[in-house]
């Protein structure tokens, strides 16, 4: 099942690292969207508020899982991986 992965960045080195980690580890069916928190875009502002993004990098999966910072685990799409995220990082 494809997932929506949203990454909130601030242009920092760690943010770029997270984007690269997720880009390499996600499957071809998952949708990746990257948002710059410094943007004046209304969609970005609303998503930041909705997900309570107060630090970057932050990864939100399917609107119900949030990982803040650089993950200390490998990012590989798969059912077991998303169960792990859901168990440990639910919003």
Task: Report each predicted region and the residues it spans.
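Thiol-based oxidoreductase modules, predominantly thioredoxin-like and allied folds used
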Residues: 8-10, 29-44
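Non-catalytic, surface beta->alpha helical segment in thiol-disulfide oxidoreductase systems
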Residues: 61-91
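Short acidic, gly/pro-rich beta-turn/loop elements at beta-sheet edges
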Residues: 17, 58, 69
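Glycine-/small-residue-rich active-site loops that bind phosphorylated ligands and cofactors
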Residues: 13-14, 40, 73
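Short, aromatic/basic amphipathic alpha-helical patches
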Residues: 22-24, 47-51
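Local sequence-structure signature of Cys/Sec-based thiol-disulfide redox active-site neighborhoods
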Residues: 1-29
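Structural micro-motif
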Residues: 49-61
């Amino acid at each position: 099942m494809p997932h929506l992965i949203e990454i909130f960045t601030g242009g920092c080195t760690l943010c770029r690292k997270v984007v690269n980690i997720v880009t390499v580890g996600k499957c071809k069916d998952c949708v990746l969207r990257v948002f710059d928190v410094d943007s004046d875009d209304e969609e970005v502002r609303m998503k930041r508020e909705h997900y309570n993004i107060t630090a970057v990098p932050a990864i939100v999966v399917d609107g119900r899982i949030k990982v803040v910072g650089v993950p200390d685990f490998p990012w590989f799409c798969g059912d077991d991986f998303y169960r792990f995220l859901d168990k440990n990082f639910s919003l």
